[in-house]
């Protein structure tokens, strides 16, 4: 009797694990993309331009034709002008399609000398495009505009 209960328990446990793991495998690309976005966010706040640029594709295109090199210069300029940079992301909407994704979010960017309050702040609506290449997500394009326009 006890072995029958143990067998049922084991079958039930295996079934739960299979369902849980199958849910994880479907969400894995989205989880990796969200982790990549979070790593970029952390790198920007830590003023690590190289780390922030790691997922940016060589063929990146941003606002008004900004390329990857221009994006790097834009980050450098912001870091030269602001001792402290803050990034606060709003809800992140991820839409996956095969090996590409579109990610939309609101970002509050702050900058200043590092004292109690930032000297400048701006909220942006951001739409980004991503490509999955060799298991890594690459940022291929980004559009941003000040919120409320």
Where are these regions (language model features)?
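Short beta-strand edge/turn micro-motifs at domain boundaries
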Residues: 26, 102, 120-149
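Sec-dependent bacterial lipoprotein signal peptides
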Residues: 1-22
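Short, low-complexity N-terminal intrinsically disordered segments enriched in polar/charged residues
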Residues: 23-55, 72
């Amino acid at each position: 009797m006890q072995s029958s209960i143990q067998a049922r328990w084991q079958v039930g446990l295996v079934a739960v694990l299979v369902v849980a793991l199958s849910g994880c495998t479907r969400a894995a690309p989205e989880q990796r993309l969200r982790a990549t976005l979070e790593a970029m966010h952390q790198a920007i706040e830590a003023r690590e331009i190289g780390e922030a640029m790691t997922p940016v594709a060589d063929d990146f295109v941003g606002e008004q034709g900004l390329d990857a090199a221009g994006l790097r210069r834009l980050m450098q300029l912001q870091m030269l002008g602001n001792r402290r940079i803050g990034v606060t992301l709003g809800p992140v909407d991820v839409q996956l399609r095969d090996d590409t994704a579109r990610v939309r979010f609101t970002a509050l960017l702050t900058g200043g000398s590092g004292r109690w309050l930032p000297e400048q702040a701006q909220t942006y609506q951001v739409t980004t495009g991503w490509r999955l290449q060799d298991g890594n997500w690459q940022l291929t394009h980004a559009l941003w505009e000040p919120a409320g326009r």
